[in-house]
């Protein structure tokens, strides 16, 4: 599809929502429906790889080089990375693990 066809097809109808084209002429249709808000600007057939990467990480390791044992924090409970950093600082400074 050349540039003239793209411009003509997106501006030919003033009542419809605009159409945008991304990399490799992927077509993105804008929609006013609520169901389209879950994955905006996502072409059909694409997958969200960040969820796959996050689900494969099961442990967070400590970077404490002074101790011989490596600390592992299981990720079975919901907590933030900041909580893990705080635990690491407490363990390193005062030897306690919350």
Swiss-Prot record:
Q: What UniProt keywords are attached to this protein's entry?
A: Abscisic acid signaling pathway, Cytoplasm, Stress response
GO cellular component terms listed in the entry, alphabetical order: cytoplasm
Its subcellular locations are: Cytoplasm
Q: Does the keyword Cytoplasm apply?
A: yes
Q: What happens when the gene is disrupted?
A: Reduced sensitivity to abiotic stresses including dehydration and abscisic acid (ABA) treatment. Slightly enhanced pollen tube growth.
Q: What induces it?
A: Reduced levels in seedlings exposed to abiotic stresses such as mannitol, drought, polyethylene glycol (PEG) and abscisic acid (ABA) treatments.
Q: Does the keyword Ribosomal protein apply?
A: no
In which tissues has expression of this protein been reported? Mainly expressed in flowers, to a lower extent, in roots and, at very low levels, in leaves and stems.
A GO term (biological process) for this protein? cellular response to abscisic acid stimulus
Q: What role is this protein assigned?
A: Acts as an opponent to RZF1 during early seedling growth in term of proline accumulation in response to dehydration and abscisic acid (ABA). Confers sensitivity to abiotic stresses such as ABA, drought and osmotic stress (e.g. mannitol treatment) by preventing proline accumulation and by reducing the expression of dehydration-inducible genes. Promotes the production of lipid peroxidation by drought stress thus leading to malondialdehyde (MDA) synthesis. Prevents pollen tube elongation. Necessary for RZF1 expression in seedlings.
This protein is called Protein PROLINE CONTENT ALTERNATIVE 22
Taxonomy of origin reads: Eukaryota, Viridiplantae, Streptophyta, Embryophyta, Tracheophyta
